[in-house]
Curated annotation (Swiss-Prot):
Zn(2+) binds at C333, H384, H510. The lineage of its organism: Bacteria, Pseudomonadati, Pseudomonadota, Betaproteobacteria, Burkholderiales. This is Threonine--tRNA ligase. PANTHER family: THREONINE--TRNA LIGASE, CHLOROPLASTIC_MITOCHONDRIAL 2 (PTHR11451:SF44), THREONINE-TRNA LIGASE (PTHR11451). One of its GO terms (biological process) is threonyl-tRNA aminoacylation. Its cofactor is Zn(2+). It comes from Burkholderia mallei (strain ATCC 23344). Belongs to the class-II aminoacyl-tRNA synthetase family. Catalyzes the attachment of threonine to tRNA(Thr) in a two-step reaction: L-threonine is first activated by ATP to form Thr-AMP and then transferred to the acceptor end of tRNA(Thr). Also edits incorrectly charged L-seryl-tRNA(Thr). The gene is thrS. Its EC number is 6.1.1.3. It catalyses: tRNA(Thr) + L-threonine + ATP = L-threonyl-tRNA(Thr) + AMP + diphosphate + H(+).
Length: 635
């Protein structure tokens, strides 16, 4: 007798072992038809999986997130099936699920063209309509290697050869195509109805640039056409908002081959940067942080003591001088500990909050670089709080409030918070971890925030809170972090004198709100589609004269506004006013001030707001008042 407990708490009993599909059918024909897989004691399995013991089971359908993953995984295999039918000499490698879709890497003697993708997608649709059953068989490693070598799939054979000989290998087949996979997969190809191939890109075999370059075909798959249409529309909007495109259009920054992953900031872009940095500096100062500056290059010995040299060296830029090894800092924390250690610290000094707009460099792979979002040289709004265990809760509460307020000011009102808890391998006692985790939980609770807990995802030296902001397109970006660290103060010898005159290690809280300034500015540009809130905009307004006779008045107006601390310039070029208006509209300047003879005589300006809104003619002082109200509204 086999007892199956269902999600609603009910228990069904079967005289013999049953498959997931049979359990679904016993519940109802609708569920049997909708079943894509099962969750057996928490593990995803195929509908063909045999249950021969008492267990809990949830039937997975296309209404479940797991169901969508199964569909995407199966569609990746459908892609490989179609490619092999159309291009038999193509070699298949790997094809995982990724955010919003999947990809599959192929080795082929020529590049796939857009026409190839169109033909492959058409063949995928034909294969799906055949509704061929997807079957699974388990074989030994040697049997699997032999099979794939016999059909000329050397990459698959190489993957399997790296698997321990004692492991069982799962092979999935539909029609004439067989692939290596851990599964699960849909029961038949007819379940795959909504998908689209997106693009082809290069990828190295096993991610190593020394290996052969493969062709990676990306695709997306969904349960409903409406969802796919919405996703494709979002991609269109994302392309319009691409910070690389807007960075060029708005003359904010550029990146060039001589400095890969490093940003050249132009005057307008640097003005935008400064608005963000100065805003953050004001907020940190008000919250009791002390700003410091630490060296960019430090001796190898410090990085060995911190553990970075042993564990992070491949991502560090290093140099040598006078027979000493140095590293350009990839992070600021070891330097902040040095400042803390300089002098005797008392418990009365704690909490001590050090902040730095620290310039860091990391040797990211060239293929991973992406505009401002993934760079090699970046600045963080980094800070480290040195405190006692009893102060963790109050410091976390203060940080949560500060972070939420900052995100709101920048226009982000949807924040997902994740709390990563202790892993199996960790330092510190269970009591210390209990205290630390509960301190972070209570801090989130005290701020009225909701969060998701991730057991086992914390670092071995402490739990962590992550702050994921959602932009105007619903995309999630991890920016803020509050990481509790019980290790680095010990490794680097940080201590303070406790109330009983004993020497104790402080707890170290690593924290950032915007994270990488470069990345955050990229997010801001895309979130606002380049039309920055007035307080952030590189230019508040531009004064435009209609004819040469108003040039002096236009210049005077601009200078008057500049003296009042406003970011205003005058465009006095001998161009048609319509041309100048169009140009500055494309630059997304919040206000255009047009002056003709009437405005000069009346000492007024004709005001056009961003979006082509005509605000009419008004005295310069009235415009200044309006502009200041706009700036304060966003602050």
């Amino acid at each position: 007798m086999v007892s199956i407990r269902l999600p609603d708490g009910s228990v069904r009993q079967y005289e013999h072992p049953v498959t997931v599909a049979e359990v679904a059918a016993s519940i109802g024909p609708g569920l049997a038809k909708a079943a894509l897989g099962g969750k057996l004691d928490g593990e995803l399995v195929d509908t063909s999986a045999l249950i021969d013991r008492d267990a809990s089971l949830a039937i997975v359908t296309d209404k479940d997130a797991d169901g969508l993953d199964i569909i995407r995984h199966s569609t990746a295999h459908l892609l490989a099936y179609a490619v092999k039918e159309l291009h038999p000499d193509a070699q298949v490698t790997i094809g995982p699920v990724i955010d919003n879709g999947f990809y599959y890497d192929f080795s082929y003697h020529r590049p796939f063209t857009p026409e190839d993708l169109e033909a492959i997608e058409k063949r995928m649709q034909e294969l799906a309509k055949r509704d061929e059953p997807v079957t699974r068989r388990v074989v030994s490693r040697d049997e699997a290697v032999s099979y794939f070598r016999s059909i000329g799939e050397k990459y698959k054979a190489e993957i399997i050869e790296s698997i321990p000989a004692s492991d069982e290998i799962k092979l999935y087949s539909h029609g004439s195509f067989t692939d290596l996979c851990r599964g699960p997969h849909v029961p038949s190809t007819g379940k795959l109805k909504v998908f689209k191939l997106m693009k082809v890109a290069g990828a190295y075999w096993r991610g190593d640039s020394k290996n052969e370059q493969l062709q990676r075909i990306y695709g997306t798959a969904w349960t409903r056409k409406e969802d796919q249409d919405a996703y494709l529309h979002m991609l269109e909007e994302a392309e319009k908002r691409d910070h690389r495109k807007l960075g060029k259009q708005l003359d904010l920054f550029h990146i060039q081959e001589e400095a890969p992953g490093m940003v050249f900031w132009h005057p307008k872009g640097w003005t935008l940067w400064q608005q963000v940095e100065q805003y953050m500096r004001r907020r940190l100062d008000a919250a009791g942080y002390l700003e410091i500056k630490t060296p960019m290059i430090m001796d190898r010995s410090l990085w060995e003591a911190s553990g970075h040299w042993q564990n992070y060296r491949e991502n560090m830029f290093t140099t040598e001088s006078e027979k000493r090894d140095y590293a350009i800092k990839p992070m600021n924390c070891p330097g902040h500990v040095q400042v803390f250690k300089h002098g005797l610290r008392s418990y009365r000094d704690l909490p001590l909050r050090y902040a730095e707009f620290g310039s860091c460099h990391r040797n990211e792979a060239s293929g991973a670089l992406h505009g401002l979002m993934r760079v090699r040289g970046f600045v963080q709004d980094d800070a480290h709080i040195f405190c006692t265990e009893d102060q963790i809760n109050s410091e976390a509460i203060a940080f949560n409030k500060l972070a939420m307020s900052v995100y709101e000011d920048f226009g982000f009102d949807r924040i997902d918070i994740k709390l990563s808890l202790r892993p199996e391998q960790r330092m510190g006692s269970d009591e210390t971890w209990d205290h630390a985790e509960e301190g972070l939980r209570n801090a989130l609770k005290a701020c009225g925030l909701e969060w998701e807990e991730l057991p086992g995802e914390g670092a071995f030296y402490g739990p962590k809170i992550e702050y994921h902001i959602k932009d105007a397109l619903g995309r999630s970006w991890q920016c803020g972090t509050l990481q509790l660290d019980m290790m680095l103060p010990e490794r680097l010898g940080a201590e303070y004198v406790a109330e009983d005159n004993s020497r104790r290690r402080p707890v170290m809280l690593h924290r950032a709100i915007v994270g990488s300034m470069e990345r955050f500015l990229g997010i801001l540009i895309e979130h606002h589609a380049g039309a920055m809130p007035v307080w952030l905009a590189p230019a508040h307004a531009v004064v435009l004269n209609i004819a040469e006779s108003q040039a002096e008045y236009a210049r005077t107006v601009a200078q008057s506004l500049q003296k009042q601390g406003l970011r205003v310039s005058a465009d006095l070029r001998n161009e048609k006013i319509s041309y100048k208006i169009r140009e500055h509209t494309l630059e997304k300047v919040p206000y255009l001030l047009v002056v003709g003879d009437k405005e000069r005589e009346a000492q007024t300006v004709a005001v056009r707001a961003r979006g082509g809104v005509d605000l009419g003619v008004m005295p310069v002082e009235a415009f200044v008042e309006r502009l200041r109200e706009d700036i304060q509204a966003f602050k």
